[in-house]
Amino acid sequence: TPFPEGVGTREEVDELLAKADSRDHLNVVFIGHVDAGKSTLSGQMLFLTGSVDERTIEKFSREAKQRNRESWFLAFIMDTSEEERAKGKTVEVGRAEFSTETRRFTILDADVGVLVISARKGEFEAGFDRSGQTREHALLAKTLGVRLLIVVVNKMDEETVQWKEERFDEIKGKLEPFLKRSGYNTKKNVHWVPISAISGANVKEAVSPEECSWYKGPTLFEVMNTLKVGGRNPYGPLRVPVLDRYNERGVIAMGKVESGMLVQGSKVMLLPVLNIATVEEVRIGESEADVVEVARPGDNVFIKLKGVGDEDIMKGFMIVDPAHPAPVATRFQAQLQLLDLDHRAVFTAGYSAVLHLHTAAEECTVDKLVALIGKDGKQVKNPRFLKSNQACICNISLTQNTPMEKFSAFQQLGRFTLRDEGRTIAIGKITGIPAASYAAVEEAARKYGK
C-alpha cells in the first residue's frame, strides 16, 4: 500500500496502551440453526457473569410463564422486541456485554464464533441438512474472519440425549469434516464443548460427574478465557469502520477499532467524504462510566465527534488517521469463491448483487471475469461464465465511493461477501485497488499535514 504502515513511535503507542483497559476485548457471534439455543445460552452467560441482575431475570421468567414458554426466560434477555418475545424467536442481532477477570466480551460480530448445535434427536439433523442454517452460518462466519470456533453441543440434558457420549461423538463425527472443508483448522482452532444452556451445566461450572462421567474437558467459559486472538495491530494506522451513528448532545459514531489507537482529543478523517473531525470523547460501553482516554484494536467504541453534523457520517464510513488514510474506490479486483447458485444457472459479467464489506453494504456489478481458478490453482483467462462453487479473479464496480483495503494489508477490511435475493452467493477478498483511488485521499492527507 502507498501509505506508511505505522503511526507514532513504538514508545508512544506503548504509552497509550498502558492507559487502555488491559483486558482483551473479544467479540463473540452466536450462530446455528433456529431453536438450537443461541439466545438461551447468551442469556445464561450474561446471568452467570452478573451482567444481568436478578430483577431482570425474574421479570422475564414471569413474562415467559404468562406465555407458556417457561423454559425460554433466558432467551428473553436477548430478545429485544415485544414481537420477538411473543414468537420466541430472536430476529434482531442482540448486543450485550459481559466480563470475566481476564477478558471483556461483546455478543455481536466477531473474533470468535460459538456454533450452537442442538443434541436433541432430529434437531441436529434438521439443522445440518442442506436447507438448515448450520452449514451456511459456519461458512459465513469463516468468510467474515471468524478463525476460532467453539462448537457448543447444547441440550445434552434433554430426555432423548441424557448426556450420552455416543450422541456427542456422532455430532462431532458428522460436523468436523464439513468444518475442515469450510477452511477451519479443526486441530488448532475448533473446540468442542457439551453443555445445557437452560441449566447452565458446563457453561461456567463443570457438569457434575453424576450427570456426565465421560467429559473431562474445560467449561465453555474456560475455553473462551484461554483463546488466543491474533492479528490486531496497535502500531498500525487507525481504522474504525462505522457501524452506526446517532445524536446525543452531539454526533456519536459506533464502531470497532480494527487497527491503531483511538485517542481522545485527536483529529480524525472520515472516509469517503474526507472531512476532518475531533474526537471529543471515547466510550467502550454505553454509560458514562465507560469513558476512556484511549481505545485499542478490538474495542467496540462510541466516539463523540466535534466538527461534523449528522449528515456527514453514516454506516459504512471509516474513521482514520488523517495522515495515514485508507484508499477510497468505486472499482477493485477480487478473488471470488462462489457458493451454491441455486437461484441462477450461471455467474457472468454483468451480475449485480449487494456487496458487504466491513460495515458497508453497497450495490455492485461484476464488470469482468478475468480468470477462472481451477482446483489445481491453474488459471483459465477470460471465462464466459462460472457455475456453483467455482473460483475466479474478477473486476467489481460499486455505485458509491467506499473506503477499503487490500486483503494482504488488512484482512478484516479487505474481505467481503456478495448477497443476492437474501442469500450469500460468494465470498471474496480484495486483491487490487486502482492507484488513482489513493490519489484523492493522499492529497487530503498532504493538505492536513501542512
Which residues fall in each region the model found?
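Conserved nucleotide-binding/hydrolysis micro-motifs of P-loop NTPases
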Residues: 51, 119-123, 155-160, 197-201, ...
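Canonical P-loop GTPase G-domain recognition
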Residues: 147, 158-237, 241-243
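Conserved Switch II/interswitch segment of TRAFAC-class P-loop GTPases
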Residues: 103-136, 142-169
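C-terminal effector/interaction modules appended to NTPase cores
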Residues: 1-28, 33-36, 87, 100-101, ...
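Alpha-helical scaffold elements adjacent to nucleotide-binding pockets in ATP/GTP-utilizing enzyme cores
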Residues: 41-45, 56-59, 136-140, 167-178, ...
